[in-house]
C-alpha cells in the first residue's frame, strides 16, 4: 500500500479487542498510519485496552459500546465481537451514521442479514463487510484460469481450506454462534459464487467435528450445482495434518486442470498440449475390437502467474476500505454477496446435527 495520501487518515474506533482484532485488523492500523488512525477503543478487559493505549496515547478508551458511539470524531467503527453480537453492534453503529466495518459472518440467519441490510440502506450504505477472500492471490489466479481456453470446457471448481487446530474458544461452541459453517465458509462461498458461471440452484452439505474441543463443527463439505455444466466442490477441514494438504483451488476442464496452493501467487496449468489435435474418431455400437483404448496424449505444464499490476492480499482489501471511506469509491464486495453467503451457511448449519 502507498504510505502517502493527500487526504487525512481514516479515524477508526475499535469494538472488541480479541484475537481477530489483534491478529488481523490492528497490525494494519499500526503499519499504515497514513491511512488509519485509531482514535477510540472499546473492550471490557482493561489489559487489552492498555495495549492500544500504549500504541496510541491519545486514543479514548471505553467499556461500553454505546458510550463510544457518542463520540463524534470518528469516521469508521471496526467491529470484531462475538458472532452473536454482530448484527446488534453493527445496527447501533450504522444508526449513529458511522462507516461500519464488520467482521464475518455478518449474521447467523438470512432474516438477520436482511435486517442488517435494511439498516445499511437507511444509513447511506455505510456497511463494509470484512470478506478478504476475493483478494487472495490463489483465488485471483483461479478466476484468471476460469477464462483460459486451454482448459477447454470447464466442468468443476474445487476449493479446499485445510488446517489442524484443536479449537477451544467460543468459535467451537454452538450456542455462541461457533462452527466452521460460519467462521470459515462465508468467505469461501463468496469465492465460489464469483467463480461459477451462473448462480447455484442446489446444494448438498455435510458437517463434522474432527479436532475441535467444543461441540461445533470444524469440517464442512458442500457441493453447489448450477444449471450449467459447472459445479463447485468445497471443503473446509480443521483436522488436516500438515504435509497432507490439497491445492486450495483446482479448475478442472476437458483438456486439463489448473492447480494452486493456498496463498501462492503462482500456479500450474497442466493441460493437453494446445498444439495437439486428436485424430477423428467416433463411438460405435458395433462389437468392439479387443484392444486398449487409451491414447498417447502430450501433456504440458505451464506456470501461471497473476497479470502484471494485479493488487492482491490483505493490502488490497484495506486499500479499498480507505478509498471507500475517504473518496466514496465503490466497495468491491457487494452486500448482497455477503447476504447470499449467510443464506448458504445457515442452510447447511440448520440441516445438520450441529444446527439442532
Question: Model features per residue range: what roles?
Answer:
Residues 126, 133-213:
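Predominantly a Rossmann-like dinucleotide-binding segment in NAD(P)-dependent oxidoreductases
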Residues 1-6, 76-78, 306-356:
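C-terminal helix-rich "cap/oligomerization" subdomain common to oxidoreductases
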Residues 250, 255-332, 336:
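C-terminal glycine/acidic-rich active-site capping loop/insertion
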Residues 102, 127-129, 260:
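Hydrophobic residues in well-ordered beta-strands that form the structural core
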Residues 1-56:
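N-terminal Rossmann-like dinucleotide-binding module
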Residues 235-243:
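Glycine-rich phosphate/pyrophosphate-binding beta-alpha loops
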Residues 56-119, 313-316:
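Beta-loop-alpha module in the N-terminal Rossmann-like domain of NAD(P)-dependent dehydrogenases
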Amino acid at each position: 500500500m502507498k504510505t502517502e495520501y493527500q487526504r487525512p487518515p481514516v479515524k477508526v474506533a475499535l469494538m472488541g479487542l480479541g484475537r481477530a482484532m489483534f491478529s488481523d485488523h490492528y497490525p494494519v492500523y499500526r503499519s499504515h498510519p497514513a491511512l488509519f488512525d485509531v482514535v477510540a477503543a472499546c473492550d471490557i478487559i482493561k489489559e487489552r485496552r492498555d495495549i492500544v493505549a500504549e500504541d496510541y496515547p491519545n486514543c479514548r478508551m471505553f467499556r461500553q459500546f454505546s458510550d463510544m458511539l457518542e463520540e463524534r470524531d470518528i469516521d469508521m467503527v471496526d467491529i470484531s465481537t462475538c458472532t452473536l453480537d454482530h448484527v446488534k453492534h453493527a445496527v447501533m453503529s450504522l444508526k449513529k451514521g458511522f462507516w461500519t466495518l464488520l467482521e464475518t459472518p455478518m449474521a447467523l440467519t438470512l432474516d438477520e442479514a436482511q435486517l442488517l441490510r435494511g439498516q445499511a440502506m437507511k444509513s447511506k450504505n455505510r456497511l463494509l463487510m470484512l470478506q478478504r477472500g476475493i483478494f487472495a492471490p490463489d483465488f485471483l489466479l483461479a478466476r484468471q484460469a476460469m477464462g483460459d481456453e486451454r482448459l477447454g470446457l470447464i466442468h468443476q471448481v474445487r476449493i479446499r481450506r485445510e488446517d489442524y487446530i484443536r479449537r477451544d474458544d467460543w468459535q467451537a461452541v454452538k450456542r455462541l454462534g461457533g462452527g466452521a459453517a460460519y467462521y470459515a465458509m462465508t468467505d469461501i462461498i463468496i469465492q465460489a459464487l464469483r467463480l461459477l458461471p451462473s448462480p447455484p440452484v442446489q446444494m448438498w452439505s455435510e458437517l463434522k467435528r474432527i479436532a475441535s474441543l467444543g461441540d461445533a463443527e470444524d469440517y464442512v463439505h458442500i457441493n453447489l450445482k448450477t444449471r450449467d455444466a459447472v459445479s463447485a466442490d468445497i471443503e473446509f477441514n480443521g483436522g488436516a495434518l500438515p504435509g497432507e494438504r490439497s491445492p486450495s483451488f483446482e479448475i478442472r476442464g476437458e483438456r486439463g486442470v489448473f492447480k494452486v496452493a493456498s496463498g501462492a501467487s503462482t500456479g500450474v496449468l497442466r493441460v493437453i498440449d494446445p498444439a495437439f489435435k486428436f485424430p477423428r474418431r467416433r463411438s460405435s455400437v458395433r462389437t468392439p475390437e479387443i484392444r486398449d483404448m487409451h491414447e498417447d496424449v502430450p501433456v504440458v505444464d505451464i506456470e501461471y502467474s497473476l497479470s502484471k499490476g494485479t493488487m492482491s492480499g490483505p493490502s488490497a482489501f484495506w486499500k479499498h476500505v480507505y478509498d471507500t471511506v475517504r473518496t466514496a469509491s465503490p466497495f468491491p464486495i457487494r452486500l448482497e454477496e455477503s447476504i447470499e453467503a449467510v443464506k448458504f451457511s445457515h442452510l447447511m448449519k440448520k440441516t445438520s446435527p450441529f444446527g439442532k
